[in-house]
Swiss-Prot record:
One of its GO terms (biological process) is L-arginine biosynthetic process. It comes from the Bacteria. Keywords: Amino-acid biosynthesis, Arginine biosynthesis, Cytoplasm, Lyase. Its EC number is 4.3.2.1. It comes from Burkholderia vietnamiensis (strain G4 / LMG 22486). It catalyses: 2-(N(omega)-L-arginino)succinate = fumarate + L-arginine. This is Argininosuccinate lyase.
Length: 469
């Protein structure tokens, strides 16, 4: 069995006097996870072969044979007919071996002027570029769903919180727009990351470049890269682009996790602000009444998973000298799983948000608790000439009195308010109660970035325009 695992004809077997052990073979093989790079590997190889032919490094007949063989291999992979072999270590050697079996010596010439070091770096960048574009689209879908829900609730009043204590009234639409802003920045980070991903390593070969008269810029143009990696050592050895993407993904998941925490809280019967559609929830095997928000709960958990992948990649790179080291094989599984986790999460969240039922009465009732308009009363006094710190102290005194009596500030009569606040009684008139309503409070925040319904609608319009850019 050992000799079968390390048989003659492998890309590097001639150097060794004894076969590799089966244990080492299985330990070092990557084909069963890096095979997802197969189609981009073929695309990279075709661009490389075309350049080799244009530079007269291989013949036109060789190029035609390579193109014919690769077309057959691509079809086999897409139909699930390709036979992946552990013996052949990785996706690159599996495809090359199959190509050589199909077309003979022309297949052996394909690797002229390149190494698996620059080949895999190119494959990862090609693949990740496409995944960044896909994730960008999914972020847009989620932003769109949030904007739809925000538009429906531009006037829906809820309590805003600090320290999970009622702070000031806001609109639910305004609250949702905060997440739109977060996911907008996430989309910007993804686009920015893409500019550094989209550089061609091919041509760096193993580490020092190649002695063949290659045309790297032609390959970059064929594959849609913005340019080439400027240094061959850097091109094959660094994975900072993957780390950067994973860091951006960790931020995406952090924002999802914050939103998830609120969804779980809002759906709790003790809060009851929203309901999540049944198709996104699960039940209990023992408690018949349960409807559990498993999707947002699981998203919170998966955030830790992506954060872990970021730490794995940072740790992977921190001790590597130049240039390529086998350590870099460990970049793929964290990267692949990060992409899968983020994409799956964004897709399900966009659908889930569209199915949320809002309960405005519960939100309003909660906003009426906790003296949420106390700051408005202080502002009322300030506008009548009282220094803010004095107004703050006076209203805090009034809040303490109302709290002891179990009533809200708005429940005080005008005479009671003046009696309890004798030092500022001369500043208080009948118009004070307009400042103590929830509607008056949110309407007064009528400036860009504020929670006034008109500002919320304007922000939604601007965000929709940004989505179309």
């Amino acid at each position: 069995m050992t000799s079968q695992l390390h048989k003659k004809g492998e890309a590097w077997s001639a150097r060794f006097s004894e076969p590799m052990s089966e244990l080492v073979k299985r330990y070092t093989s990557s084909v069963f996870f890096d095979k997802r790079l197969a189609l981009v590997d073929i695309a990279g190889s075709l661009a490389h072969a075309s350049m080799l032919a244009a530079q007269k490094i291989i013949s036109a007949d060789d190029l035609a044979a390579i193109e014919r063989g690769m077309a057959q291999i691509k079809g086999e992979i897409e139909r699930g007919e390709f036979e992946w072999q552990l013996d052949l270590e990785d996706v690159h050697l599996n495809i090359e071996a199959r190509l050589t079996a199909l077309i003979g010596d022309a297949g052996k010439r394909l690797h002229t002027g390149r190494s698996r070091n620059d080949q895999v770096a190119t494959d990862i960048r090609l693949w990740l570029r496409g995944e960044i574009d896909r994730i960008g689209g999914l972020l847009n879908d989620l932003r769109g769903a949030l904007l739809d829900l925000a538009e429906q609730n531009a006037d829906t009043i809820m309590p805003g919180f600090t320290h999970l204590q009622v702070a000031q009234p806001v609109t639910f639409g305004h609250h949702l727009l905060a997440y739109v802003e977060m996911f907008t920045r996430d989309a910007q980070r993804m686009r920015d990351c893409r500019t550094r991903v989209n550089r061609l390593p091919l041509g760096a070969a193993a580490l020092a470049g190649t002695s063949y008269p290659i045309d790297r810029h032609a390959v970059a143009k064929t594959l849609g890269f913005d340019g080439i990696c400027a240094n061959s050592l850097d091109a094959v050895s660094d994975r900072d682009f993957a780390i950067e993407f994973t860091a951006a993904s960790a931020l995406v998941m952090t924002h999802v996790s914050r939103f998830s925490e609120e969804l779980v809280l809002w759906m709790s019967p003790r809060v009851g602000f929203i309901d999540i559609a049944d198709r996104f929830c699960t039940g209990s095997s023992i408690m018949p009444q349960k409807k559990n928000p498993d999707v947002p709960e699981l998203a919170r958990g998966k955030t830790g998973r992506v954060n872990g992948h970021l730490m794995a990649l940072l740790t992977l790179m921190k001790g590597q000298p130049l240039a390529y080291n086998k350590d870099n094989q460990e970049d793929k599984e964290p990267l692949f799983d990060t992409v899968d986790t983020v994409a799956d999460t964004l897709r399900i969240f966009a659908e889930m948000v569209a199915g949320i039922t809002v309960k405005p009465d519960a939100m309003r009732a909660a906003a009426l608790q906790g003296f949420s308009t106390a700051t408005d009363l202080a502002d009322y006094l300030v506008k009548r000439g009282l220094p803010f710190r004095d107004a703050h102290e006076a209203v805090a005194h009034a809040v303490r009195i109302c709290d002891d009596r179990g009533i809200d500030l708005a429940d005080l009569t005008l005479d009671e308010m003046k009696q309890e606040l004798p030092n500022v009684a001369h500043l208080i008139g009948d118009d004070v109660f307009g400042y103590l309503t929830l509607e008056g409070s949110v309407a007064s925040r009528n400036h860009p970035g504020g929670t006034a319904p008109d500002q919320v609608r304007a922000a939604i319009k601007a965000a929709r325009a940004a989505l179309g850019e």
